[in-house]
Amino acid sequence: MIRLLTATALCAFFASASAAEPRARDLGVPFEGATGALNAITDVAGVTVGQVTLIEDLASGKKVRTGVTAILPRGKQTLDAPVFGAWFALNGNGEMTGTAWIDESGQLEGPVMLTNTHSVGVVRDAVIAERVRSGVADTSGYWWSLPVVAETWDGELNDINGFHVRPEHVSQALANASSGPVAEGNVGGGTGMICHEFKCGIGTASRLIKADAGGNYTVGVLVQANYGMRDPLRIAGVPVGQYLRNDRIYSTAAPAQGETGSIIIVVATDAPLLPHQLKRIAKRAGMGLARMGSYAGNGSGDIFLAFSTANAASMKEAAVSQASFVGLEHLDGVFEATVQATEEAIVNAMVAARDMQGNDGHYAKAISHAGLVKVLKRFGRYAPRK
C-alpha cells in the first residue's frame, strides 16, 4: 500500500516555498494531505514549467488576454526523452492533440502545451519547429512528431480570433521553463480563463505519498481552469457559490444557461506506473474536479493527462526493455493524492486570479478573499495557517 503523508510531517518543507501572492492555504482553506516543498507540479523531480503571458490593449480597441503554458516532463531533455503517459476525456467538447499516439504507444513524447482554442495549431507547429532546431539531429530522414497541445476557450476576455499567440511565444515558454515555483492565476494559457463565473486560470498543487517499500513518491497537478457555473461551486465541501452570488461576469452577450467551459488537468508523478495505470490516474482527476461542483456539462471539454517520470531507462530503444511498476493493490495512495491535488490546484487558480477587463467590454471579477473566508467561517471550515 502507498500511504499519503500527514500534513504535519512536512510543514518545514512547504514553509520554504516562494509565495509572492496568497494561495488557498494562506487564506485558511483546509485541504487533506501533505504537499511537496512548492505545492506545485514542479515538486515532481525533473518536471519544469514555462509560461508566456500576453496582455495588451490594441489601438483597434481589441484586448489581448491569452498566452502559452509549457510542461516539460523531463526538463531540457523532454524533446528527446519520452515518458509513459495516458489521457482521459470526462467530457470531450475540447481538444488535446497527439492523444491517438499516446493511446497506441503508451508514451508521451515532448512537452505538454496549454493555450487557447484557436491557437492550438500554431503552438503544435512551433513545438515541432523547436524540436527540429534544438533536438537531436535526425540522421534517418524519417523523423516525425505528434505534439500534445490542449486548449480551453478564452474568447470572453481575449480577442481569440486575432491569433495573437505566435511561434516565438512557444519558444519562449519552452526556454524559460524552470523547476521552481509556478505562477498561477492570470498567466500563460490561463490568462483569459474563467471558472465558476469567477476569474480563474492556471493553478497547481502536489502531494507526497509514502510507499511501504520505503521512500516517498510525489504527485503533482497543474490545471488550466475555464469551466463551471456559480451556484454549484464548492470549496472544501462548503457551498461557496450559493453565498458569493455577486460579482458575476459582465458580458454584452446573453448569460450562459449551462456549463459550457472546459478544464485541462495534467497529472505528473515519479511513482513507477505503466500506461494502463496512468489511465486510471487520469480518471481520478475527474473526482477532484467533482469536489469543486463540476458536473461535466454537455458543452464542457474536460480532458486529463497523466504521466510518470520513472522508468527512464526503459524508454530507450532496445529489443527487450524492462520497467518497474506499483502493484495493483498499492495504487490507492496515488489515486487519493491525485484527487486531493486536483481540487487544491483549482482553488489555487481561483485564489491567485485577479479582476480582468477583457475584450468587447467583458469583465470578470476574481473571487473575494474576504468573502471566501467569511463563508468558510460560517461553516466551521476556516483553518488559518499556524
Region locations from a protein language model:
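Positively charged n-region of N-terminal signal peptides that target proteins for export
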Residues: 1-4
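Bacterial N-terminal signal peptides
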Residues: 6-15
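Alpha/propeptide regions of enzymes that mature by internal proteolysis
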Residues: 20-386
